[in-house]
Amino acid sequence: MSTGKIIQVIGAVIDVEFARDNTPKVYDALNVVEAGLVLEVQQQIGDGVVRTIAMGSSDGLRRGMEVKNTNAPISVPVGHGTLGRIMNVLGEPIDEAGPIEYTEKRSIHQAPPAYDELALSTEILETGIKVVDLICPFAKGGKVGLFGGAGVGKTVTMMELINNIAKEHSGYSVFAGVGERTREGNDFYYEMKDSNVLDKVSLVYGQMNEPPGNRLRVALSGLTIAEGFRDEKRDVLMFIDNIYRYTLAGTEVSALLGRMPSAVGYQPTLAAEMGALQERITSTKTGSITSVQAVYVPADDLTDPSPATTFSHLDATIVLSRQIAELGIYPAVDPLDSTSRQLDPLVVGQDHYETARAVQKVLQRYKELKDIIAILGMDELSDEDKKIVDRARKIQRFLSQPFHVAEVFTGNPGKFVSLKDTVASFKAIVNGEYDHLPEQAFYMVGSIQEAIEKAKTL
């Protein structure tokens, strides 16, 4: 184990000097013995000097401190011992529940599976959320992005997905909290505990208050745990909240590492860093990883380089819209902007496909008529258009749904709606079978039967 000494500290970036014939490799983990801090090598500058990123606070470091090379990358425990536990980026427990029992530790830097190991799947993963199952169905082993600005419900929608999938499919999940609020991480832990699904979830947190090195690597730590379950012939769910903060952490250290910034100040290696993470989230012949990633959209601008780079890796995109949230419709999913590769007659069947497209057609027509209604009022519309507007408003309200995880705020018990019921209900609304019901009856209900019951009380 070779030793070196710190020669420069600039925020999270630390230069360490070793003997020239003992220079650490890129991605090796180094230990600052006195401070109990782990550094990860990013660059070899020459003359035995390496540039590293600190995986914790660099407060109190000084030049000349001794640093030991572990001769290995950062490794985290994998397997059943991680279930129900909260870990940090280094795989150390932070839930005060004793040490983690494990038989194997893996490096957080792994090569993606080889081409001949990959497996394709067209199986649909039922989520119980109407708008998702109808408009942007998930593929087992696919990647899903939840796009939205600040405060439109990304984290709540993600918590509902974890809750539903853990209860209905009893699969293992890994949750990587990347640069999100510590309060949300805390709420999430107790939410899982109360729902009795904590023993099926591994939690890896590197929250907002952590230094950038921590946030840059915590997604990889979570992914390594998910890969461990996948290699045990399991179907795993990987949740990342929030993938934008992973990019942002890279941006924070990029300039300090001496790289020229690219568009909007992002790191020039943005696409490569994103690819290194996303290419590992995939299904092999042994098991599958289905991933759901929350993507913060800066200033609601989907063309920003960070969300734009993420888009290219996804199979389905769920776009949360502020305009829909303002109407009080939650989940605030935009049915015209959200897409899925699985929405194909060969995958979901002709009936589902036609219903989804009919719903989108009605909503698109309503969107076009909105300007006319705003200027001239409803009376100037043809009878056919009046019908479309009426149905569109019902569809819009019926796309809302009470969530289990939001029960404490709303007082409405959460609803899980099967895919069969969802398709049949929307087909009936589009065909005009419920034209006689008031639109308020469709708001915040589960199945169409509940809407009929609610209409009797209005």
From Swiss-Prot:
Which residues hold ATP? 148-155
Q: Which Pfam families match?
A: ATP-synt_ab, ATP-synt_ab_N, ATP-synt_VA_C
Topology class, membrane: Peripheral membrane protein
* Signal sequence extent: none
Disulfide bonds listed in the record: none
Question: Which Gene3D superfamilies does the record match to this protein?
Answer: 2.40.10.170, Bovine Mitochondrial F1-atpase, Atp Synthase Beta Chain, Chain D, domain 3, P-loop containing nucleotide triphosphate hydrolases
Q: Which enzyme type, at the first EC level?
A: translocase
What GO terms fall under cellular component here? plasma membrane; proton-transporting ATP synthase complex
Q: What is its EC number?
A: 7.1.2.2
One Gene Ontology molecular-function label: ATP hydrolysis activity
State the SUPFAM superfamilies in the record: C-terminal domain of alpha and beta subunits of F1 ATP synthase, N-terminal domain of alpha and beta subunits of F1 ATP synthase, P-loop containing nucleoside triphosphate hydrolases
Question: What superkingdom heads the lineage?
Answer: Bacteria
The record's catalysed reaction(s) read: ATP + H2O + 4 H(+)(in) = ADP + phosphate + 5 H(+)(out)
Q: Which UniProt key words apply to this protein?
A: ATP synthesis, ATP-binding, Cell inner membrane, Cell membrane, CF(1), Hydrogen ion transport, Ion transport, Membrane, Nucleotide-binding, Translocase, Transport
Q: Name its cellular compartments.
A: Cell inner membrane
Q: Which CDD domains match?
A: ATP-synt_F1_beta_C, ATP-synt_F1_beta_N, F1-ATPase_beta_CD
Recorded hits in HAMAP family, A to Z, give: ATP_synth_beta_bact
NCBIfam families, A to Z: atpD
As for what it does, the entry says:
Produces ATP from ADP in the presence of a proton gradient across the membrane. The catalytic sites are hosted primarily by the beta subunits.
Q: Which family does it belong to?
A: Belongs to the ATPase alpha/beta chains family.
Tell me the subunit arrangement.
F-type ATPases have 2 components, CF(1) - the catalytic core - and CF(0) - the membrane proton channel. CF(1) has five subunits: alpha(3), beta(3), gamma(1), delta(1), epsilon(1). CF(0) has three main subunits: a(1), b(2) and c(9-12). The alpha and beta chains form an alternating ring which encloses part of the gamma chain. CF(1) is attached to CF(0) by a central stalk formed by the gamma and epsilon chains, while a peripheral stalk is formed by the delta and b chains.
This chain's protein is named: ATP synthase subunit beta
Species of origin reads Francisella tularensis subsp. tularensis (strain SCHU S4 / Schu 4)
Lineage at the top is:
Bacteria, Pseudomonadati, Pseudomonadota, Gammaproteobacteria, Thiotrichales
